[in-house]
Amino acid sequence: MSKQILILPGDGIGHEIVAEAVKVLEHVNVRHTLNLRLSFDALGGAAYEKYGSPLADETLARARDADAVLLGAVGGPQWDTIDPALRPERGLLKIRAQLGLFANLRPALLYPQLADASTLKPEVVAGLDILIVRELTGGLYFGQPRGSRISKNGEREAFDTLPYCESEIRRILKVGFEMARLRGKKLCSVDKANVLASSQLWRTVAGEMAKDYPDVTLSHMYVDNAAMQLVRHPKQFDVIVTENMFGDILSDQASMLTGSIGMLPSASLDANNKGMYEPCHGSAPDIAGQGVANPLATILSVAMLLRYSMGHIKTADAIEHAVGVVLDSGLRTADIWSEGMTKVGTVAMGDAVVAAL
């Protein structure tokens, strides 16, 4: 029985990087007889231009029917002045919410070949392997009420709401505990419980759940301290679990510990491990169309897709190994290039990974 993957290239460099990931996916599909069927559609700004909406109803229906979704990136300055409800990012938020993709897994893994590319000293980041588990469908980005108005004294003001219910907290903490159990058995729950009521509930629930995971060491950390500790001593962390906005910020910070956000994949999963997979980086409109974008994060997102949503562990391992082989050979895109390495473009990097497979 075949499995269906919906491909959404998105905007900016999305089409370029996704093309290389699809190249890898098609190669392993044939070589490993995976019986995968690929289809394509638009999301974000591309969907706004095609359908008049950043997420068309028919695209959402196709995503529901698919076994997994592979996304490039969304957004661009040409859509910054349109109705906020129609901006590309709203399509991304909507598809996550409608598909119930509440758990975002963002690894921050430093390839030893790229230790010099990190902005931190090699001895601080050597061997770095962190997983950030971010709650994706609740909190400040979705909370109601939200909006803007004129206050009683005539000023413009805007407001947002940060709600979390116990069931939302429990299900993301469960993912955090389970992932920690599979890794180094250390879980750091990040909150702002000294200020926020939602974080106080979060910390209480985490403490209650820890009793069910006696093999996992749970620690708590305020988000401001966590941001500092990620730079001071990042290797103290194994798995970090946190709410939506904190995870958004910390995962981007952690990505730069690895040398380039262009190396980092991500997975967004529902309760049944059906998911959407995308690189951690954005649409990079400043380099779109130049053929210089790093496709490795998207290729590694394919590996995560095969591992978590398809159960093809050996194929996922093979892709990750192939990326390591390519880095060993000295090939680098511009974002990870250093003296003595060979600078290549997007297509050449994708071809090299296929050759290594």
From Swiss-Prot:
Top-tier EC class: oxidoreductase
UniProt keywords, alphabetically: Amino-acid biosynthesis, Branched-chain amino acid biosynthesis, Cytoplasm, Leucine biosynthesis, Magnesium, Manganese, Metal-binding, NAD, Oxidoreductase
Bound cofactor: record note: Binds 1 Mg(2+) or Mn(2+) ion per subunit.
Alphabetized GO MF terms: 3-isopropylmalate dehydrogenase activity; magnesium ion binding; NAD binding
Residues of the site described as Important for catalysis: 141, 192
Listed cofactors: Mg(2+); Mn(2+)
Record-listed substrate binding positions: 96, 106, 134, 224
Reaction catalysed by this enzyme: (2R,3S)-3-isopropylmalate + NAD(+) = 4-methyl-2-oxopentanoate + CO2 + NADH
E.C. number(s) listed in UniProt: 1.1.1.85
GO biological process: L-leucine biosynthetic process
Positions contributing to NAD(+) binding: 76-89, 282-294
Locations listed in the record: Cytoplasm
Domain of life per record: Bacteria
Residues annotated for Mg(2+) binding in this entry: 224, 248, 252
Pathway named in the protein's UniProt entry: Amino-acid biosynthesis; L-leucine biosynthesis; L-leucine from 3-methyl-2-oxobutanoate: step 3/4
Main location: cytoplasm
GO cellular component: cytosol
Role according to the record: Catalyzes the oxidation of 3-carboxy-2-hydroxy-4-methylpentanoate (3-isopropylmalate) to 3-carboxy-4-methyl-2-oxopentanoate. The product decarboxylates to 4-methyl-2 oxopentanoate.
PANTHER family: 3-ISOPROPYLMALATE DEHYDROGENASE (PTHR42979:SF1)
Subunit field text: Homodimer.
UniProt family annotation: Belongs to the isocitrate and isopropylmalate dehydrogenases family. LeuB type 1 subfamily.
HAMAP family reported in the protein's UniProt record: LeuB_type1
Listed name of the protein: 3-isopropylmalate dehydrogenase
Organism (species): Xylella fastidiosa (strain 9a5c)
Gene of this entry: leuB
